[in-house]
Amino acid sequence: CFEPDMKLIRGIHNLSQAPHGCVLTIGNFDGVHRGHQALLQRLRAEGRQRGLPVVVMIFEPQPLELFAADKAPARLTRLREKLSYLAESGVDYVLCVRFDRRFAALTAQDFISELLVRRLGVQFLAVGDDFRFGAGRQGDFLLLQKAGAEYGFDVTSTQTFCEGGVRISSTAVRQALADDDLVQAENLLGHPFTISGRVVHGDELGRTIGFPTANLPLRRQVSPVKGVYAVEVTGLGDKPLVGVANIGTRPTVAGVRQQLEVHLLDV
């Protein structure tokens, strides 16, 4: 599903698969938008200069989804999509850390000394200046700078990427999608907004209106888009298909679920 050159490391316990020593960034990377892409380009240049691999550390689930699931924003990308975009950006390794209560209890000092220094051997670290980490969110950018001076690694702030006075961020992309401004969303992302998933058998109501229907349950509590859209569908044949998509909720025994229904035209 992603470039063979990029290696996915699932969990800290599998870090022996990665070489010791890296340039590193940490974040959610939701959407892998143009701001993320600019950061990754900068990291690749740093990695080439130092002769070190580029490592991106992400968390699954995202921290807010563990601590306040009802307040967590809609995801722009599933994990599989995120990995694909990161691979296209030239990342060497993605470390996907299982974010659970146990990991969240790790002290800020242990996060630095055990994970960043002992396990990863970080030489260059780029994070947002508002980055918080460790139990109780005790760790911050200043603590990382002090640790860098102590352990011998460089720490830099990820620069805000703006265009036309608009800060390019996952939040800005979500707002554009909420406003049904797909052109602006694509401009911020650097690629069209897509939703992917596995087609499942539905109730075959589509047959009664004369169009085949593809049903994709969305494994997320909330979708960044809802309503009816003209879409292009890939992965069901040799060429893209034209369709009309309806994104909304569907009643289930357990409550409701997010679902994407696509009526395929000219099939």
Question: Positions of the model-derived regions?
Answer:
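Short, Lys/Arg-enriched N-terminal segments with co-localized hydrophobic residues
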Residues: 1-5
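Short acidic-hydrophobic, aromatic-tinged amphipathic segments that line or gate anion-handling sites
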Residues: 7-14, 74, 95
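N-terminal catalytic cores of NTP/NDP-binding nucleotidyl/phosphoryl-transfer enzymes
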Residues: 15-78
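Residue-level signal for inorganic ion chemistry
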Residues: 33, 86, 125, 185, ...
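A glycine-rich helix N-cap at a beta->alpha junction
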Residues: 78-94
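Classical nucleotidyltransferase
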Residues: 102-212
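Phosphate/ribose-recognition catalytic cores of enzymes acting on nucleotide-derived substrates
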Residues: 202-267
